[in-house]
Every structure is written in C-alpha cells, then in structure tokens.
Swiss-Prot record:
Catalyzes the pyruvoyl-dependent decarboxylation of aspartate to produce beta-alanine. It catalyses: L-aspartate + H(+) = beta-alanine + CO2. Pathway: Cofactor biosynthesis; (R)-pantothenate biosynthesis; beta-alanine from L-aspartate: step 1/1. Is synthesized initially as an inactive proenzyme, which is activated by self-cleavage at a specific serine bond to produce a beta-subunit with a hydroxyl group at its C-terminus and an alpha-subunit with a pyruvoyl group at its N-terminus. Its main location: cytoplasm. The modification Pyruvic acid (Ser) is found at residue 25. This is Aspartate 1-decarboxylase. Heterooctamer of four alpha and four beta subunits. Its EC number is 4.1.1.11. One of its GO terms (biological process) is alanine biosynthetic process. It is found in: Cytoplasm. InterPro entries: Asp_de-COase-like_dom_sf (IPR009010), Asp_decarbox (IPR003190). The gene is panD. PANTHER family: ASPARTATE 1-DECARBOXYLASE.
Amino acid sequence: MRVEILSSKIHRATVTDANLNYVGSITIDEELMRAANLLENQKVEILDVNNGERFATYVIKGKKGEICLNGAAARKVCIGDIVIIVAYASMKFKKAKKFSPTIVHVNAKNEMIKK
C-alpha cells in the first residue's frame, strides 16, 4: 500500500507580493527552496494562516526573501499574510513509517531560523 505523506514544509512564511498578471505559481526564495528540498515546478499546497485558504500551485525560483503568489492564486492571499508551504510524497507504507519530512522555519523576513 502507498500513502501520501508530508515531505517538505516552509513554516509561517510571509507573503511579499501577489502578482495577478503572472501566468501562475508561487515564487519562493531559492535558498528556502534548497533548504526545504523543493524543486522548480514541483506541486505544493499553500495554507494561508490569516484567511484559512488552502490551494495548490507549483514552485518557481525567486530572489532572497521572496514569497510571491502569482496568477489566480494572487486573489487568495494578501501581502503580509502568513502562509505554510507544503509538499507531499507518495511512498510505501513501510518506508513512510520511518520517513522524516524536511521542515524549514522562517522569520517575518523569510529568513531561515531553524531547519
């Protein structure tokens, strides 16, 4: 049996921009992507702590400190909102029981404070 399990999380990032006119995605600081083991174009779920929205999109590389929701997703957040960015992996149940996700904590400037 296979299960979906949390593989990566950026915890409590601050939305720095919302660009309605971009094609889509979430732009994430490249350093945070690397720390969280997120790949460009990888599917992620966005959880907005401020308004309760939950939605899926894909990742693109951004500049230092950047967390920007693009395209239609820009309507789901406000600049300054706190979001949790999560990715899941499908794995066999036995492996999932031993798996530890990568969790990156950030401060209000989207700087890594704990991994």
